[in-house]
UniProtKB/Swiss-Prot annotation:
PROSITE patterns: SSRP (PS01317). It comes from the Bacteria. The gene is smpB. SUPFAM superfamilies: Small protein B (SmpB) (SSF74982). Required for rescue of stalled ribosomes mediated by trans-translation. Binds to transfer-messenger RNA (tmRNA), required for stable association of tmRNA with ribosomes. tmRNA and SmpB together mimic tRNA shape, replacing the anticodon stem-loop with SmpB. tmRNA is encoded by the ssrA gene; the 2 termini fold to resemble tRNA(Ala) and it encodes a 'tag peptide', a short internal open reading frame. During trans-translation Ala-aminoacylated tmRNA acts like a tRNA, entering the A-site of stalled ribosomes, displacing the stalled mRNA. Keywords: Cytoplasm, RNA-binding. This is SsrA-binding protein.
Amino acid sequence: MSEKLICNNKKAYHDYFIEEKFEAGMVLKGTEVKSLRIGKANLNDSFALVKNGEAFLHNLHISPYDFGNRENHDPDRMRKLLLHKKEIGKLFSMIREQGYTVVPLRLYFKDGLVKVEVGLAKGKKLYDKREDMKKKDMRRDVAVALKERNR
């Protein structure tokens, strides 16, 4: 099971608490897959919604394929996520009742198929972000101090 990472969504970990993760497939066109093989995708500001029992990914930007013809895809089109019915039901209930959102965390190839890891997330407040930044700075300072000490 080889996985080749296409892109990460680092902003999601900064802006949200990730409660649970799901792996989903996506319905794509041929030129989209070719663009993804080159690594031309952007997950920032993208999110998933559930409509009529189906999950869709919005604002996922996949650049047009350079060598595509007039049949090239729309870069910002809505893409259907392939999840099990129970997973979609769980996501829908959490979004509707408890104020969660679904954000894509990473996009990757798994055994030749494009997969997206989506996370059930709750938004962070500003003080949470500051607290995380302080912890990150402290960890970095400790790592630098240990490195200096071991020299």
